[in-house]
Amino acid sequence: MRMTAHITHKIRIYPNQTQEAWLRKACGAARFVYNWALTDWAKQYEEFKQEHTKPKPSRVGLANQLNKLKISDPSLKWLTETSDQPAQNALQDLDAAFKRFFKGQASYPSLKKAKAKRSFRQYIRSKIFINGKLKLASLKSPIKMAEQWRFAPDAKFLFLTVSEQNNKWYAAITAEIPDCALPKGLDSETV
Protein backbone atom coordinates (compact mmCIF):
# COMPACT_ATOMS: atom_id res chain seq x y z
CA MET A 1 0.00 0.00 0.00
CA ARG A 2 1.20 3.51 -0.78
CA MET A 3 0.55 6.74 1.12
CA THR A 4 1.87 10.23 1.74
CA ALA A 5 4.32 10.70 4.61
CA HIS A 6 5.78 13.71 6.40
CA ILE A 7 9.47 13.57 7.13
CA THR A 8 11.86 15.99 8.84
CA HIS A 9 15.55 16.11 7.98
CA LYS A 10 17.79 18.04 10.38
CA ILE A 11 20.90 19.42 8.71
CA ARG A 12 23.81 21.34 10.24
CA ILE A 13 24.26 24.71 8.55
CA TYR A 14 27.28 27.01 8.48
CA PRO A 15 26.21 30.66 8.26
CA ASN A 16 28.79 33.38 7.68
CA GLN A 17 28.89 36.33 10.13
CA THR A 18 26.26 38.37 8.26
CA GLN A 19 23.93 35.38 7.96
CA GLU A 20 24.43 34.45 11.61
CA ALA A 21 23.53 38.00 12.68
CA TRP A 22 20.33 37.72 10.59
CA LEU A 23 19.51 34.30 12.10
CA ARG A 24 20.03 35.63 15.64
CA LYS A 25 17.78 38.59 14.86
CA ALA A 26 15.07 36.26 13.49
CA CYS A 27 15.29 34.07 16.63
CA GLY A 28 15.11 37.20 18.79
CA ALA A 29 12.11 38.49 16.85
CA ALA A 30 10.25 35.20 17.33
CA ARG A 31 10.97 35.17 21.09
CA PHE A 32 10.15 38.88 21.52
CA VAL A 33 6.83 38.60 19.66
CA TYR A 34 5.84 35.44 21.58
CA ASN A 35 6.57 37.08 24.95
CA TRP A 36 4.94 40.39 23.97
CA ALA A 37 1.83 38.57 22.73
CA LEU A 38 1.65 36.35 25.84
CA THR A 39 1.74 39.41 28.12
CA ASP A 40 -0.79 41.32 26.01
CA TRP A 41 -3.07 38.27 25.64
CA ALA A 42 -3.22 37.88 29.43
CA LYS A 43 -4.04 41.59 29.86
CA GLN A 44 -6.76 41.49 27.18
CA TYR A 45 -8.25 38.32 28.64
CA GLU A 46 -8.51 39.88 32.11
CA GLU A 47 -10.25 42.92 30.57
CA PHE A 48 -12.59 40.60 28.66
CA LYS A 49 -13.48 38.65 31.84
CA GLN A 50 -14.24 41.86 33.77
CA GLU A 51 -16.08 43.65 31.00
CA HIS A 52 -17.67 41.42 28.36
CA THR A 53 -17.98 44.32 25.93
CA LYS A 54 -14.20 44.13 25.37
CA PRO A 55 -13.08 41.76 22.60
CA LYS A 56 -11.69 38.35 23.49
CA PRO A 57 -7.98 38.14 22.61
CA SER A 58 -7.16 36.46 19.30
CA ARG A 59 -4.16 35.75 17.10
CA VAL A 60 -5.52 37.98 14.34
CA GLY A 61 -6.12 40.85 16.77
CA LEU A 62 -2.60 40.53 18.17
CA ALA A 63 -1.12 40.39 14.65
CA ASN A 64 -2.93 43.64 13.77
CA GLN A 65 -1.71 45.24 17.01
CA LEU A 66 1.84 44.12 16.31
CA ASN A 67 1.78 45.58 12.80
CA LYS A 68 0.59 48.94 14.15
CA LEU A 69 3.19 48.81 16.92
CA LYS A 70 6.04 48.14 14.46
CA ILE A 71 5.05 51.27 12.53
CA SER A 72 4.45 53.56 15.51
CA ASP A 73 7.31 52.51 17.82
CA PRO A 74 10.79 53.35 16.44
CA SER A 75 12.45 51.07 19.00
CA LEU A 76 10.84 48.07 17.24
CA LYS A 77 12.28 48.87 13.80
CA TRP A 78 14.62 45.88 14.17
CA LEU A 79 11.60 43.56 13.84
CA THR A 80 11.29 44.62 10.19
CA GLU A 81 14.91 43.67 9.40
CA THR A 82 14.09 39.96 9.05
CA SER A 83 11.26 38.03 7.47
CA ASP A 84 7.75 38.51 8.91
CA GLN A 85 7.34 34.75 9.17
CA PRO A 86 9.16 34.13 12.48
CA ALA A 87 6.94 36.72 14.19
CA GLN A 88 3.73 35.44 12.60
CA ASN A 89 4.62 31.84 13.46
CA ALA A 90 5.34 32.86 17.06
CA LEU A 91 1.76 34.21 17.22
CA GLN A 92 0.46 30.92 15.79
CA ASP A 93 2.47 28.97 18.37
CA LEU A 94 1.02 31.06 21.19
CA ASP A 95 -2.50 30.64 19.80
CA ALA A 96 -2.00 26.85 19.72
CA ALA A 97 -0.58 26.92 23.27
CA PHE A 98 -3.67 28.74 24.57
CA LYS A 99 -6.00 26.34 22.73
CA ARG A 100 -4.25 23.39 24.41
CA PHE A 101 -4.42 25.20 27.77
CA PHE A 102 -8.17 25.89 27.52
CA LYS A 103 -8.80 22.25 26.51
CA GLY A 104 -6.92 21.12 29.63
CA GLN A 105 -4.17 19.47 27.58
CA ALA A 106 -1.30 21.71 28.74
CA SER A 107 -0.32 24.17 31.43
CA TYR A 108 -0.56 27.94 30.99
CA PRO A 109 1.97 29.17 28.39
CA SER A 110 5.15 30.63 29.84
CA LEU A 111 7.56 33.30 28.67
CA LYS A 112 10.44 32.18 26.48
CA LYS A 113 13.80 32.79 28.14
CA ALA A 114 16.72 34.40 26.33
CA LYS A 115 19.07 31.61 27.44
CA ALA A 116 16.80 28.84 26.15
CA LYS A 117 17.15 27.20 22.73
CA ARG A 118 16.94 29.84 20.03
CA SER A 119 14.78 28.97 17.06
CA PHE A 120 12.27 30.21 14.51
CA ARG A 121 10.05 28.60 11.90
CA GLN A 122 9.33 29.59 8.30
CA TYR A 123 6.92 28.16 5.78
CA ILE A 124 8.55 27.22 2.51
CA ARG A 125 6.95 28.94 -0.47
CA SER A 126 9.73 28.76 -3.02
CA LYS A 127 12.88 26.89 -3.96
CA ILE A 128 15.06 26.41 -0.86
CA PHE A 129 18.14 24.68 -2.27
CA ILE A 130 20.45 26.63 -4.57
CA ASN A 131 23.70 24.97 -5.66
CA GLY A 132 23.69 22.74 -2.59
CA LYS A 133 23.05 25.63 -0.20
CA LEU A 134 19.97 26.58 1.84
CA LYS A 135 18.03 29.67 0.74
CA LEU A 136 15.87 31.39 3.38
CA ALA A 137 13.22 34.00 2.64
CA SER A 138 14.51 37.56 3.16
CA LEU A 139 18.14 36.44 3.47
CA LYS A 140 20.16 37.62 0.47
CA SER A 141 22.73 34.83 0.20
CA PRO A 142 22.23 31.06 0.65
CA ILE A 143 23.74 29.28 3.67
CA LYS A 144 26.28 26.46 3.36
CA MET A 145 24.96 23.05 4.53
CA ALA A 146 26.85 20.07 5.98
CA GLU A 147 24.96 17.66 3.72
CA GLN A 148 22.40 17.60 0.94
CA TRP A 149 18.69 16.80 1.23
CA ARG A 150 18.79 13.00 1.06
CA PHE A 151 15.16 12.09 0.57
CA ALA A 152 12.74 12.10 -2.35
CA PRO A 153 13.56 14.76 -4.95
CA ASP A 154 9.82 15.17 -5.62
CA ALA A 155 9.12 16.08 -1.97
CA LYS A 156 6.86 19.03 -1.27
CA PHE A 157 8.69 21.20 1.27
CA LEU A 158 6.34 22.49 4.00
CA PHE A 159 8.38 24.43 6.56
CA LEU A 160 11.75 24.63 8.18
CA THR A 161 12.85 25.35 11.71
CA VAL A 162 16.21 27.02 12.19
CA SER A 163 17.74 26.54 15.63
CA GLU A 164 20.96 27.18 17.50
CA GLN A 165 22.28 24.62 19.99
CA ASN A 166 25.69 24.94 21.65
CA ASN A 167 26.76 27.65 19.17
CA LYS A 168 25.93 25.37 16.23
CA TRP A 169 23.15 26.13 13.74
CA TYR A 170 20.70 23.60 12.31
CA ALA A 171 17.86 23.62 9.79
CA ALA A 172 15.13 21.02 10.30
CA ILE A 173 13.28 20.76 6.99
CA THR A 174 9.84 19.15 7.01
CA ALA A 175 8.50 17.81 3.74
CA GLU A 176 5.63 15.77 2.40
CA ILE A 177 6.81 12.72 0.48
CA PRO A 178 4.17 11.46 -1.93
CA ASP A 179 3.47 7.86 -2.75
CA CYS A 180 5.59 6.23 -0.01
CA ALA A 181 5.61 2.48 0.31
CA LEU A 182 4.65 1.23 3.76
CA PRO A 183 6.76 -1.50 5.34
CA LYS A 184 5.34 -5.02 4.97
CA GLY A 185 2.77 -5.90 7.61
CA LEU A 186 1.60 -2.29 8.03
CA ASP A 187 -1.34 -0.59 6.43
CA SER A 188 -2.64 2.97 6.60
CA GLU A 189 -4.93 2.00 9.52
CA THR A 190 -1.96 0.81 11.60
CA VAL A 191 0.05 3.96 10.95
Task: Give the location of each predicted region.
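Nucleic-acid substrate recognition interfaces
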Residues: 1-191
